[in-house]
Amino acid sequence: MAKWVYKFEEGNASMRNLLGGKGCNLAEMTILGMPIPQGFTVTTEACTEYYNSGKQITQEIQDQIFEAITWLEELNGKKFGDTEDPLLVSVRSGARASMPGMMDTILNLGLNDVAVEGFAKKTGNPRFAYDSYRRFIQMYSDVVMEVPKSHFEKIIDAMKEEKGVHFDTDLTADDLKELAEKFKAVYKEAMNGEEFPQEPKDQLMGAVKAVFRSWDNPRAIVYRRMNDIPGDWGTAVNVQTMVFGNKGETSGTGVAFTRNPSTGEKGIYGEYLINAQGEDVVAGVRTPQPITQLENDMPDCYKQFMDLAMKLEKHFRDMQDMEFTIEEGKLYFLQTRNGKRTAPAALQIACDLVDEGMITEEEAVVRIEAKSLDQLLHPTFNPAALKAGEVIGSALPASPGAAAGKVYFTADEAKAAHEKGERVILVRLETSPEDIEGMHAAEGILTVRGGMTSHAAVVARGMGTCCVSGCGEIKINEEAKTFELGGHTFAEGDYISLDGSTGKIYKGDIETQEASVSGSFERIMVWADKFRTLKVRTNADTPEDTLNAVKLGAEGIGLCRTEHMFFEADRIMKIRKMILSDSVEAREEALNELIPFQKGDFKAMYKALEGRPMTVRYLDPPLHEFVPHTEEEQAELAKNMGLTLAEVKAKVDELHEFNPMMGHRGCRLAVTYPEIAKMQTRAVMEAAIEVKEETGIDIVPEIMIPLVGEKKELKFVKDVVVEVAEQVKKEKGSDMQYHIGTMIEIPRAALTADAIAEEAEFFSFGTNDLTQMTFGFSRDDAGKFLDSYYKAKIYESDPFARLDQTGVGQLVEMAVKKGRQTRPGLKCGICGEHGGDPSSVEFCHKVGLNYVSCSPFRVPIARLAAAQAALNNK
């Protein structure tokens, strides 16, 4: 018989895949003798079995759960469902990868109308008993039956107003008893007359099902896609004996970190609430006290807490994020996990742990989440603009960085505005997991309620989004879509600015600037460079991009898109003249006017590179992208060229293609208009030779012919390039070497790579187009249906963001092998967007590519991911 349920004492840290992160850590804490409420874990395999059984919990799993409940009853001397002294439990999810806010918790399970009265008598504290019951009704209704939380919040707010009190804790036992009745009425109405469940066993199975179900709720799917978590992992369920932080003034609950999750600074960091349950701190309903205040409130508990927190950090050798409850002066740990942290904090903590002798340099490099380095490059405010800014309020600096944008009040509105290209600040009373897509779309998040460990703070830090939380002075009018702060009223669409590092809120749109990186970043990067074997280049089209990328550690340019150089105002007219010319001579004349511009750009880039390699891709987009499409611009072009408007319109219409991405572009342009390749070759070679003469820098130009699908195609263009390159060398008296290669971006090129390698001296995989051509859908149109594919679990991630290793990856691997059979030592790289995606970088390492190339600000990510790939695949 399969084992679906494990007591905490039966597990250990090595069982993460089976018990989930929370379950294996609770097991490990049990081994360490920590004060934790005992319980058991229903495994991730049980979750998979639930889905395989048509979303039903099999009888075998149910039997094992109730056997474990019997064991808990014996352990606690209480009965589940007893009317006088009931055993109460909490039910929490726990996937193997931490997913903050994605899964749902239920506390006080086991209470019903009769048990609550016995519970009140047994504890001698009716207020506590009815507070626990109304919380359970609210959580169960929300999590299990999906009755919106807002229904209950409105009732609580109305009662507090009626009683003239500010906080839930000011309500009396009778008030809370009345609340419980009102909550049950809400449940009954929402459930079409069905009463709130009174049988504890039914409550428990409903809760376990809800946790399994929540693995596949929309926000969990979005979070998994954003964080590359496979959908088939499933979640475990942890059932734990309840301990109560809401028993009075000697009880409380809190969340704490062993180091600051925003800065990485060593020292306890966190907050707690007296007379509260765990969800109160995380949900941010009341603004909590800093953890250091606990030393004054409960000195013995504080000392014990500090000792145990340090013990946990030493044991797990990482910064810990701990949840704890104090019940009438007795401390319990509810869970611990490696804490989520900002990228600057991750770097600082990793370096400090190396210095403290807890971990090695290799472990430090592997621990940093490569994607998180994006956060380091988030903007700060321009100091001059900031001086002129008007501070309208301040609150908690929950996630660092600076952001300015238009105010929106709901996640859907924020997402819609972002999709229109607007910069968005999401303003909410408090955020919840349902807001995840709006939070992802926002430049910054501002909340009225909640502390440094609220949902908004934790999720924003994880995403690297600026967040200011707990600004209680804000008055939001959700119906009017306005909020008041600092004597000002802001409507939807008005600009505000947030500083997530100081907690200040500013009126208006304050200019931001790029961030600078810290010493710990440099240390980690030095270690990463020591361990990686894969080179990292950048995709850059301007001298500015090149300098930025070199500063961030790029070892060359893997893709210089020459067409981007033509779109500037003084150049676009010349390329348009070339396109509209009807003879080779006229085209050559127009192109010759472009040579100084292209050459000037190449010279500046070669100088910025200081001898690092640069792969220059020849003109790739279809010509229709360069021609004017408005009548006004067409008339101006006609005037400049001495043509009629009708002639210009006819030429523009002639260039129109039904499927331009698979049309007259790439090397096909050079076959029909060899003069374009001639001009570009002259510009590259003259620039390289002149820079070498001026600076003494050794340069070997790498010329890349795009969109090749046939060896003869490449040979045709290569012959044109060689003829001009040799001519320029002769004119300049130079013996400069150069290489001619191709982009592998058509499946046929990968299939015939052995033949293509007879002509190509290097391969660069253009995985954007290779993905389009292999899947048969375009990057521009896929967004219309990919969401449906995620929901149907056909795809788990966007194939344009994360390389499809099964299909597209197979073509890449095949092309590398075939190419190197023909030309041993063939240099192979990747220059699509995938070059900065960590999982794709690891794939590139495994198949033996020489380098990856990505956008300048993703260079540090690729450097770190390449080191991790080398260390993880030793």
From Swiss-Prot:
Residues 534-874 are annotated as: C-terminal. The modification Phosphothreonine is found at T453. Residues 340-399 are annotated as: Linker 1. The keyword Lipid metabolism does not apply. The keyword Kinase applies. Residues 499-533 are annotated as: Linker 2. Phosphorylation of Thr-453 in the dark inactivates the enzyme. Dephosphorylation upon light stimulation reactivates the enzyme. Keywords: ATP-binding, Kinase, Magnesium, Metal-binding, Nucleotide-binding, Phosphoprotein, Transferase. GO terms for molecular function: ATP binding; kinase activity; metal ion binding; pyruvate, phosphate dikinase activity. Activated by light-induced dephosphorylation. Inhibited by dark-induced phosphorylation. Both reactions are catalyzed by PDRP1. Residues 400-498 are annotated as: Central. Transmembrane segments: none annotated. ATP binds at R92. Its EC number is 2.7.9.1. It holds the Pfam family PPDK_N. Mg(2+) binds at E745, D769. Its cofactor is Mg(2+). It is an enzyme of class 2 (transferase). It catalyses: pyruvate + phosphate + ATP = phosphoenolpyruvate + AMP + diphosphate + H(+). The active site is at H455, C831. The reaction takes place in three steps, each mediated by a carrier histidine residue located on the surface of the central domain. The two first partial reactions are catalyzed at an active site located on the N-terminal domain, and the third partial reaction is catalyzed at an active site located on the C-terminal domain. For catalytic turnover, the central domain swivels from the concave surface of the N-terminal domain to that of the C-terminal domain. Catalyzes the reversible phosphorylation of pyruvate and phosphate. In E.histolytica and C.symbiosus, PPDK functions in the direction of ATP synthesis. The N-terminal domain contains the ATP/Pi binding site, the central domain the pyrophosphate/phosphate carrier histidine, and the C-terminal domain the pyruvate binding site. This is Pyruvate, phosphate dikinase.
